[in-house]
A protein has these predicted regions:
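TPR/TPR-like alpha-solenoid signature
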Residues: 17, 51-53, 87-88, 94, ...
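Residue-level recognition of tetratricopeptide repeat
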Residues: 21, 55-57, 91, 125
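Long, repeat-rich segments with strong aromatic
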Residues: 70, 78-102
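Structural motif corresponding to the intra-repeat A-B loop/turn of tetratricopeptide repeats
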Residues: 26, 60-62, 96, 130-131
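Terminal, low-structured helical/coil segments at or just beyond the last alpha-helical repeat
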Residues: 133-170
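Start-of-helix register in tetratricopeptide repeats
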Residues: 14, 31, 48-51, 84, ...
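Solenoid-like repeat scaffolds
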Residues: 4-13, 36-45, 59, 70-81, ...
Length: 170
């Protein structure tokens, strides 16, 4: 709530982008879209406004995912592809069910930064959908030392499994 107050008080594109990100995390895609449109009215060509638009489109889902994918493609082609842009493109591909395309983007991202925790987490998810082992990506993520959300969830699931197994054995 405090972060939203701070973002709402400012009028910079950066603060607006943080607000879009917060709204996406709060599962309020309609408000994220509205905030993104406000940013585009300020400066439609700015990279940060385009990224915020892609985030809002991903959160909205449906046909807007393709629009988000186009934004990531345009930014990667216009500037330089980064692991974050590859990850954004891969997430769009996964949301559209194109796991082979997602894997291709993620392998490009991991070639640029082999220790990027987001890329490793997305590779693990993508591998699972492709019927491949995700263990090496999870292990690599653990070795980065980054406290990633995916690792927290995996740890909680492992704990739940251990508790359930203990009840079965008892």
């Amino acid at each position: 709530a405090e972060a939203m107050k701070c973002c709402h008080a400012g009028s910079s594109l950066e603060l607006n982008a943080i607000m879009v990100n917060l709204l996406c995390k709060l599962d309020r895609p309609e408000l994220a879209e509205k905030q993104s449109k406000m940013m585009q009215q300020i400066d439609d060509d700015s990279t940060i406004a385009q990224l915020a638009c892609a985030w809002a489109h991903c959160a909205s889902g449906g046909k807007k995912i393709q629009d988000a994918s186009y934004i990531y493609q345009e930014l990667g082609d216009k500037y330089k592809w980064t692991p974050k842009l590859y990850n954004g493109s891969a997430v769009c591909s996964m949301m559209m069910g194109s796991y082979d395309d997602a894997e291709r983007d993620l392998l490009e991202a991991i070639a640029l930064d082999p220790k990027d925790a987001d890329t490793l987490a997305n590779l693990a998810a993508c591998a699972s959908h492709l019927g491949k082992s995700s263990g090496r990506f999870i292990n690599a993520m653990k070795q980065t030392g980054v406290a990633h959300d995916a690792l927290t969830k995996i740890s909680a699931l492992e704990d739940d499994f251990e508790r359930a197994a203990a009840h079965v054995d008892a």
